[in-house]
């Protein structure tokens, strides 16, 4: 549920998460839920967003709906980028590393306490990188004091399993599987810990950890649906795929586009639909 201090219905913004579920998150639906908490973010003093397969923000114009939806979209889409490239000496990560070392090659249930280690690590990464993440999402600096995941819950338990015949990592709603290892070094432990952390939060919600890019998108990426302001919808056709990609090229130190990244992603998506539609008429 998303609660904003808005009484008047004016504009609506939403995001679709990939889920094989109903909208209630029951037995056939989401196997996990968590809340994104922000404080002193742009014009928003405090807000909590609990994930669901379809999230709609409804309220007054300029009440902060797009800010909240954009930050949620950004964590789901760009969250993998905040994990360190080298083993960290931070206390939160070292606790995850120690836990995993104790359970190498042993089928182990992820208890509430174990899961909390990984949520704490992810929150520390969010805290230290929140300004850079927000700038990447919005294409300009936005004030943010707190950004973290709270109220993590699961409908079903999950465990770590090891397979001597496996050659790759894999995940389902019930287990995270790794190939058996003789003696994992710190780099291998980091890769496994990042995989565990990401999937505890994002399995079935965002794109999997290892997902190829097909036609510019990763399977499972959330879709941001901006408010349907007429002027915006009339201009999208003028924005072509190449110009958007150039504007947000990772090689450019300062992005030249004035659009936020969720809007660019949405425009690229509907541009592809437009191209496919034209091709089908030929």
Question: What do the PLM-derived regions correspond to, one by one?
Answer:
Residues 1-259:
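P-loop NTPase switch/coupling surface
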Residues 253-271:
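Aromatic- and Gly/Pro-rich amphipathic surface segment
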Residues 268, 273-282:
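ABC-family P-loop ATPase nucleotide-binding domains
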């Amino acid at each position: 549920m998303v609660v904003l201090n808005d009484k008047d219905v004016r504009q609506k913004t939403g995001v679709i998460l990939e889920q094989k579920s109903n909208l209630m998150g029951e037995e056939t639906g989401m196997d996990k839920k968590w809340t994104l908490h922000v404080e002193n973010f742009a014009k928003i003093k405090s807000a909590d967003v609990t994930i669901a397969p379809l999230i709609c923000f409804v309220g007054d114009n300029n009440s902060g709906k797009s800010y909240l939806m954009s930050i949620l979209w950004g964590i789901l889409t760009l969250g993998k980028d905040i994990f360190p490239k080298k083993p960290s000496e931070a206390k939160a990560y070292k606790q995850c590393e120690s836990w995993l070392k104790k359970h190498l090659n042993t089928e182990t249930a992820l208890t509430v306490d174990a899961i909390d280690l990984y949520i704490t690590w992810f929150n520390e990464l969010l805290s230290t990188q929140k300004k850079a993440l927000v700038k990447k999402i919005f294409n300009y600096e936005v004030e943010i004091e707190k950004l973290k995941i709270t109220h993590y819950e699961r409908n079903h338990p999950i465990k770590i399993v090891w397979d001597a015949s496996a050659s790759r990592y894999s995940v389902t709603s019930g287990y995270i599987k790794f190939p058996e290892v003789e003696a994992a070094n710190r780099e291998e432990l980091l890769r496994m810990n990042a995989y565990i952390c990401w999937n505890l939060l994002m399995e079935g919600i965002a794109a999997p950890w290892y997902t190829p890019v097909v036609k510019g998108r990763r399977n499972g990426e959330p879709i941001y649906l901006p408010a349907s302001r007429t002027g915006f919808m009339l201009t999208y056709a003028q924005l072509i795929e190449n110009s958007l990609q150039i504007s947000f090229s990772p090689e450019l130190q300062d992005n030249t586009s004035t659009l936020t990244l969720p809007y660019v992603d949405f425009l690229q998506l509907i541009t592809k639909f437009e191209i496919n539609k034209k091709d089908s008429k030929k």
